[in-house]
Each structure stands twice: as structure tokens, then as C-alpha cells.
A protein has these predicted regions:
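Conserved alpha/beta-domain cores
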Residues: 1-277
Length: 277
């Protein structure tokens, strides 16, 4: 999103390509996941592409904005594809509602590939396309979504907000922003099980992934890949190394048709040996 903020004009394909290329080259041979831009139309009003919305979180943002403005989406996808010739890149689509959303995005992506091929421009023809699972409808429909996507990533920050209908930045309702709410955990478990059935890689990003209290819980739910804050790396690594097969049994035996208080009891008693290191 930094490419679009504090600018007077939209970034060109060439500008984006140069930035993505530098990232790909510097990180090679490690893979880099580039999420397509996740700004709302309200943030792009200065470019004449949107207008202030009463509730941007439920408005024209993420992939739905990209699908509405093909020219912007097309430019970004071409830039990423061109940069993929210089390193290992993956593309992640945010704010996916369902598999139909993803299919439409893939169709535009395929068109960009055909364009570059006809122009003789090099790119990685096998670049993976992933979907963010951050809306309850996507979590519930993970089985179908996983048949379309090459990989999945659970975005816990938005998943909590949309599941509990709470703005975590609003002090009046912030107490309802409970990351370990049973309903949130059930959606995560549902997504994990669906991804396992479809044999599609799934990771978790957001605040939960970097929180020592939640790492054992996520591992126990079957998560095997976390996207974390660099400052939490060594702590999270130590916790993961402390996890064992018993942890998964503890979580699998736990009934998430329960209360927040009982989940907290699970975290602060049964899971304590795993994160208190």
C-alpha cells in the first residue's frame, strides 16, 4: 500500500516493477509473497478513483476494488509478473469472499500472462496464486476456495473483526476484540481442516501469529506456517521447538463450543508449559 499513499499520481507499471524486482533479487533464493493492494476506495479518492465511505471496512476495498478497477489491478499484476523473472515470487489476493472472487482474479492474471508472453517479456509462468482467508464466508468456504488457490493465508486481524463485528481501533468496543473467541478459533480450525483435505499450504498472519500466548494454540490447531513480526522471531521459534505431539491432542480434545473464559483456562493452564519458556 505504501506505493499508493502520499502520492499525487498512481504508480506506473515501471515504478512498481523496479520495486518488486529489487525485493525479488535481494531475497533470492527465498520466496517473497506480494499481496495485491488492500486499500479502500476512500484512500484513493485523491486519484479520483473512490470516495469517502461511512464504513470502509465493509466497503469497496481489497480485491473487490481491484476487480472494479481492472486497469490498476492489471498494472500491478504485470509489474509483479515481470519481477518474477528475477526471483521467487508469490501473489496473494486480499479480501476474498469466495472461490468466484478468486476465479475472476485468476482470469485477469492469466490475461496478463498472455500479454507478456505475446510481447516476449520474461516471467515465471508457474508463479503461485494465494487467497487471504479473513472473511467468515471465505473461512466457511475454504474447501471450495482451496480447489482454486495454490496456497492460503489466514489473516487473523480482519477475521476477528469481521467475525465479531468489532473495530479493534474503536475504544468503545475494543473489549469485544477477542482473538481467542471460540467462534474465531472454530473458523480457523475449519480452514485448517479444509486445507489439509485439499492438500493446499496454509499459513497464519496477523497479531495472533506473533503472540506467544497464541502460538501453541495455532500449532495445536494444525498450523505449520506463521508470518510473524521480526521482533518476535526468536521467541516464537523457541515456543515452536517446545511443542510436541501431546499439544495437538490437547487441542483436538478441546470443545470449542464453549465460552471465552474456558478458552482462556485452556491457554493459561494446559498450554502454559509451551509458551512459558
Amino acid at each position: 500500500e505504501f506505493l499508493y499513499i502520499s502520492r499525487q499520481n498512481l504508480p506506473s507499471e515501471e515504478e512498481q516493477f523496479e520495486i518488486y524486482r529489487q525485493i525479488a533479487e535481494r531475497m533470492a533464493p527465498a520466496p517473497v509473497t506480494i499481496r495485491t493492494f488492500d486499500l479502500g476506495g476512500d484512500k484513493l479518492a485523491p486519484f479520483g478513483l473512490g470516495e469517502p465511505e461511512e464504513n470502509p471496512y465493509l466497503g469497496n476495498r481489497g480485491l473487490r476494488f481491484s476487480l472494479l478497477h481492472h486497469e490498476i489491478f492489471h498494472t500491478q499484476l504485470r509489474a509483479i509478473l515481470r519481477a518474477s523473472a528475477f526471483g521467487k515470487l508469490k501473489i496473494l489476493f486480499p479480501m476474498i469472499i469466495d472461490a468466484e472472487d478468486f476465479s475472476e482474479a485468476r482470469h485477469i492474471f492469466n490475461h496478463c500472462q498472455e500479454e507478456l508472453y505475446s510481447q516476449g517479456i520474461a516471467f515465471d509462468s508457474s508463479i503461485p496464486l494465494g487467497a487471504m482467508v479473513e472473511i467468515p464466508s471465505a473461512a466457511i468456504g475454504t474447501d471450495t476456495l482451496a480447489q482454486e488457490a495454490d496456497f492460503l493465508s489466514i489473516g487473523t486481524n480482519d477475521l476477528v473483526q469481521y467475525t465479531l463485528a468489532v473495530d479493534r481501533n474503536n475504544e468503545n468496543v475494543s473489549r469485544y476484540y477477542i482473538q481467542h473467541h471460540p467462534s474465531v478459533l472454530k473458523l480457523i480450525r475449519m480452514s485448517v481442516q479444509a486445507a489439509q483435505r485439499q492438500k493446499v499450504p496454509l499459513s497464519v498472519c496477523g497479531e495472533m501469529a506473533s503472540n506467544p500466548l497464541y502460538v501453541p494454540l495455532l500449532i495445536g490447531l494444525g498450523i505449520r506456517e506463521l508470518s510473524i513480526n521480526p521482533t518476535a522471531f526468536f521467541t516464537v521459534k523457541a515456543i515452536i521447538r517446545n511443542c510436541d505431539a501431546k499439544l495437538e491432542r490437547i487441542i483436538s480434545d478441546f470443545d470449542f463450543n464453549t465460552s471465552v473464559r474456558e478458552v482462556e483456562q485452556l491457554i493459561y493452564t494446559h498450554l502454559k508449559p509451551y509458551y512459558q519458556i
